[in-house]
Amino acid sequence: MSQVYNFSAGPAMLPTQVLKQMQDELLEYGNTKASVMEISHRDPYFIAMAQKLEQDLRDLMGIPNHYKVLFLQGGASAQFSMVPINLLQGKTKANYAHTGHWSKKAITEGKRYCEVNICTDSSDNKYTDIDVFENWNIDPDGAYLHYTPNETIAGLEFDYVPEVDMPLVADMSSSILSREVDVSKYGVIYASAQKNIGIAGLTIVIVRENLMGNVLANQPVLFDYTTQANNDSMYNTPSTYSWYAASRVFEWLKQQGGLSAMAKINQTKAKTLYDAINGSDFYSNPVAIKYRSWMNVPFLLADESLNGFFLEKAIANNLITLKGHRSVGGMRASIYNAMPQDGINELVNFMKVFEKENT
């Protein structure tokens, strides 16, 4: 099979090395005489893998000891509910930054539990820019500030971390593990797995211990961070294969040199693609340069009537899943950790040829 580069926004491309390892181990995990999908989550082999999974993530991200790491289900969407359930703690207000599709969904769910103060809003500029933090309208009575560091659909990414005197909550689904992060600045970090962590079915939550133990009354027991922490994220049967896939991705990340090395790789990949877009009158990106995403790169063709032909030719050249989200249009290249520089080079070369042949 020839090399195919998958630019899907999620579920996304996995490292080839990880896929091959998963293939090799599919029928028998370790000496269990069974697939990892078939063994109990209480099996000593699985428990050992789960413990290493957490330790590898702690090592990669430098997670302090006074933070719990939870491996949950329900996607980031479940966290839109779990965050207010766990963090309101007697307060009736929370601050949310509205910078795109996913932060809007978090806001909608947050309103079910409290009064939401939208402290900054990028909808007026169609999610192409972010206001400087000095202009934000933070309600000091809010229980927390929630923001989305990288908006997958618009390709809009913060280049700063908001500094507030309240717990900071971040939906890092599409940026986690792409660079180093100072976890101590956050009260809660959460991320669904199907972009930079592994496969769908797993959501990672990193929560500071002093924010646990005071949930809203009459809520599902599974939505209590303390319940999950006290049961090692196994109050119910976990998504075992998703845990396993993440364990293999974490090992791969360590082999690449960790997150400082990945940051350099990701910066180079993004620069290669943005340089090609910026140097062309045929392609464009609407996002303010300062806030362009490393992970998700939308680009528009000057002649929209060529969109379908572009996608058809791209697939023929083994460049797949480049269609942009319907709210933005055009194309979108999602270039998470697993996308190698060679994939970016192939895309850029194709874009140049396509431009030459269609102008």
UniProtKB/Swiss-Prot annotation:
Residues bearing PTM N6-(pyridoxal phosphate)lysine: 195
GO terms assigned for molecular function: O-phospho-L-serine:2-oxoglutarate aminotransferase activity; pyridoxal phosphate binding
Chain positions recorded as pyridoxal 5'-phosphate binding sites: 76-77, 102, 152, 171, 194, 236-237
Catalysed reactions, as listed in the record: O-phospho-L-serine + 2-oxoglutarate = 3-phosphooxypyruvate + L-glutamate; 4-(phosphooxy)-L-threonine + 2-oxoglutarate = (R)-3-hydroxy-2-oxo-4-phosphooxybutanoate + L-glutamate
GO term, biological process aspect, one: pyridoxine biosynthetic process
Record's GO cellular component terms: cytoplasm
Cofactor(s) of this protein: pyridoxal 5'-phosphate
Pathway assignment: Amino-acid biosynthesis; L-serine biosynthesis; L-serine from 3-phospho-D-glycerate: step 2/3; Cofactor biosynthesis; pyridoxine 5'-phosphate biosynthesis; pyridoxine 5'-phosphate from D-erythrose 4-phosphate: step 3/5
Cellular compartments annotated: Cytoplasm
Enzyme Commission number: 2.6.1.52
Pfam families: Aminotran_5
Domain of life: Bacteria
Chain residues that bind L-glutamate: 42
Keywords: Amino-acid biosynthesis, Aminotransferase, Cytoplasm, Pyridoxal phosphate, Pyridoxine biosynthesis, Serine biosynthesis, Transferase
Role played: Catalyzes the reversible conversion of 3-phosphohydroxypyruvate to phosphoserine and of 3-hydroxy-2-oxo-4-phosphonooxybutanoate to phosphohydroxythreonine.
Subunit structure: Homodimer.
NCBIfam families per UniProt: PRK05355.1, serC_1
Record-stated family: Belongs to the class-V pyridoxal-phosphate-dependent aminotransferase family. SerC subfamily.
Listed name of the protein: Phosphoserine aminotransferase
Upper taxonomic lineage: Bacteria, Pseudomonadati, Pseudomonadota, Gammaproteobacteria, Candidatus Pseudothioglobaceae
